[in-house]
């Protein structure tokens, strides 16, 4: 199997073929996902909550991300692997470059950073130094204390601001964008306005791809279950079948449905 590259996702967008991605944090699950056909994975700072048991992503460190990136890379050597730069790991462009080097050496193909137009210089510096960047707009969990909780973003006038941010990130060199917890109508506008692939989570079925935290996809999330989550394991019966069902429902547009979407 050839390594998956960003060009595959560009082709999917051009051909209007939806694609499924998922978070992964260790060797065994990464191998399972790869074996069942998921070729894009994210080592997310969500590990702070799902793996480490914190109530937010803020305690996660760059070394935490690098550790899990190494494990996932061993399990899925040919996947396109995105890794988050965690809270305060990219406060300046120079700091972003230093920390991106750590996770890239650990096996990442691309780094994901949260924020809008204020990141333009950072995105430029990273891409000029051969570090591919995935942006992240909407509900950005590292900003939970600014937002006052995990709330829907991009309603009303904020929608145009988010679209402007997305265009600015693309112009700066970002090659992917994650949209989290935004109205379907806004997600559609952003996806159509950008030439780069847009991956949604809580953004309806109008984006180019979808991502889920693996614990949500398997129904093993403790505490609050997000509206956009679906327990594929409950219907499928085993983990491999659940992964295949998740992929099939994303690719056909069945998931996410109206019950998983915001307006």
Curated annotation (Swiss-Prot):
Cofactor(s) listed in the protein's UniProt record: Mg(2+)
GO molecular function: 3-methyl-2-oxobutanoate hydroxymethyltransferase activity; magnesium ion binding
The keyword Magnesium appears for this protein: yes
GO cellular component, one term: cytoplasm
Keyword Cytoplasm tagged: yes
NCBIfam families: panB (TIGR00222), PRK00311.1 (NF001452)
The name this protein goes by in its record: 3-methyl-2-oxobutanoate hydroxymethyltransferase
UniProt organism field: Salmonella agona (strain SL483)
Gene: panB
